[in-house]
């Protein structure tokens, strides 16, 4: 416990907040190459086969990114755009792949929340 005189001399040091998306190096998105595309199971109590990919980013960091939406066309060596955003029931998955950009196609037959999944407006 410092004395008041010590606080007057030195003051308190601010705590530095830890960055949640360190691999993006301050960018909103990063481009990367898929090194492995696979499925994994979520934590309890959920049950599914979640689609994820290991991606080597242009910042030379390899991360695990979630592939949102139903169905995808990704395989090894696909170029993808990665954004921040964790998946709560997949430990270690702190990034998401942006659908509809670079080699990633949008979700087919998507009617609502289309912009999140890179789906074009359907011709009526």
Swiss-Prot record:
A Gene Ontology biological process in which this protein takes part is: translation
Q: Where is the composition biased (Basic residues)?
A: 108-118
Domain of life of the organism in this record? Answer: Bacteria
Q: Does the keyword field hold Nuclease? A: no
* One Pfam assignment: Ribosom_S12_S23
> What molecular functions are annotated in GO for this chain?
rRNA binding; structural constituent of ribosome; tRNA binding
Gene3D superfamilies in the record = Nucleic acid-binding proteins (2.40.50.140)
Q: Which residues carry this modification: 3-methylthioaspartic acid?
A: 89
Disulphide bridges: none
Per the record, what is one GO cellular component? Answer: small ribosomal subunit
Where does the record place the region Disordered? Answer: 105-124
**UniProt-listed PROSITE patterns:** RIBOSOMAL_S12
Query: InterPro entries of this UniProt entry?
Result: NA-bd_OB-fold (IPR012340), Ribosomal_uS12 (IPR006032), Ribosomal_uS12_bac (IPR005679)
Q: Which UniProt keywords apply?
A: Methylation, Ribonucleoprotein, Ribosomal protein, RNA-binding, rRNA-binding, tRNA-binding
This protein's assembly is summarised as: Part of the 30S ribosomal subunit. Contacts proteins S8 and S17. May interact with IF1 in the 30S initiation complex.
Family designation: Belongs to the universal ribosomal protein uS12 family.
What is this protein's function per UniProt?
A: With S4 and S5 plays an important role in translational accuracy. Interacts with and stabilizes bases of the 16S rRNA that are involved in tRNA selection in the A site and with the mRNA backbone. Located at the interface of the 30S and 50S subunits, it traverses the body of the 30S subunit contacting proteins on the other side and probably holding the rRNA structure together. The combined cluster of proteins S8, S12 and S17 appears to hold together the shoulder and platform of the 30S subunit.
Spell out the protein name for this chain.
Answer: Small ribosomal subunit protein uS12
**Protein species of origin:** Mycolicibacterium smegmatis (strain ATCC 700084 / mc(2)155) (Mycobacterium smegmatis)
Q: Which gene encodes it?
A: rpsL
């Amino acid at each position: 416990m410092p004395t008041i005189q010590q606080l007057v001399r030195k003051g308190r040091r601010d705590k530095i907040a830890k960055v949640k998306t360190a691999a993006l190096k301050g960018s909103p998105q990063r481009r990367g190459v898929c090194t492995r595309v696979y499925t994994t199971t979520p934590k309890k109590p959920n049950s599914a086969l979640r689609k994820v990919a290991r991606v080597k980013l242009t910042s030379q960091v390899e991360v695990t990114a979630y592939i949102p939406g139903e169905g995808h066309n990704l395989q090894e060596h696909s170029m993808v755009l990665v954004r921040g955003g964790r998946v709560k029931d997949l430990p270690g998955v702190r990034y998401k792949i942006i659908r509809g950009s670079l080699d990633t196609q949008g979700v087919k037959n998507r009617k609502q929340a289309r912009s999140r999944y890179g789906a074009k407006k359907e011709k009526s």
